[in-house]
């Protein structure tokens, strides 16, 4: 019988050695980019650290929060779990491409006007998920919206305002309502009973001023 030998993986790297990099071709926001990546590099790190596209945020690094959502060939994808090598030749779309001009995308406008964003950390992921939903389904109902965003986590809004924002954006994209002006800044009121704030609230004794 022929001698059989156990399968062996690659030899471990010596202390101080770094994994060899490989140049991959990525199509990011319509532009071809060549980047040298390690076998273990994930797309999130490549976008942020190598290409300077920091709009995609890092949340859990475990695929549970959805903050890092990008489009990969049109499909919402968690960039923290996607190896950069596997994205080679695919169409990668990040939050930076949603509104390349001076005007906001209807989804971005709706998130502002409806109060769908508070701390803003999770917002890029929600916007990317919502844009993908409305591109394939221009008139989703509440259940379809909630299902689509179920992979995105928000610790601030409670989701109702996010759902409302998606519905408003969908109506604008269908031409049923006119685009509304975006708030002038992060302190702009979102509703008839909200008052604009001029300074961030601070606890007494924290060294800052409270609201005036």
Task: Identify the meaning behind each predicted range.
Residues 1-212:
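Signature of N-terminal electron-transfer/Fe-S-associated modules in redox systems
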């Amino acid at each position: 019988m022929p001698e059989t030998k156990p399968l062996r993986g690659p030899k471990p790297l010596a202390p101080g050695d770094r994994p060899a990099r490989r140049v991959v071709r990525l199509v990011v926001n319509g532009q071809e980019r060549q980047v040298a990546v390690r076998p273990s590099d994930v797309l999130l790190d490549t976008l942020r650290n190598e290409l300077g596209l920091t709009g995609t945020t890092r949340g859990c690094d475990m695929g549970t929060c959805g903050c890092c959502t990008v489009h990969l060939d049109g499909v919402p994808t968690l960039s923290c779990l996607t190896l950069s090598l596997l994205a080679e030749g695919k169409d990668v779309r990040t939050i930076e491409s949603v509104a390349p001009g001076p005007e906001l995308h209807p989804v971005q406008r709706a998130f502002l006007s409806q109060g769908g964003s508070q701390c803003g950390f999770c917002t890029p992921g929600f916007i990317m998920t919502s844009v993908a939903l409305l591109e394939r389904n221009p008139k989703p109902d509440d259940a379809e919206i909630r299902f689509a965003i179920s992979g995105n986590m928000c610790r601030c809004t409670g989701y109702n305002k996010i759902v409302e924002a998606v519905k408003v954006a969908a109506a604008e994209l269908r031409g049923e309502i006119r685009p509304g002006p975006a708030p002038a800044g992060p302190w702009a009121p979102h509703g008839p009973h909200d008052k604009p704030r001029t300074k961030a609230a601070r606890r007494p004794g924290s060294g800052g001023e409270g609201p005036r």
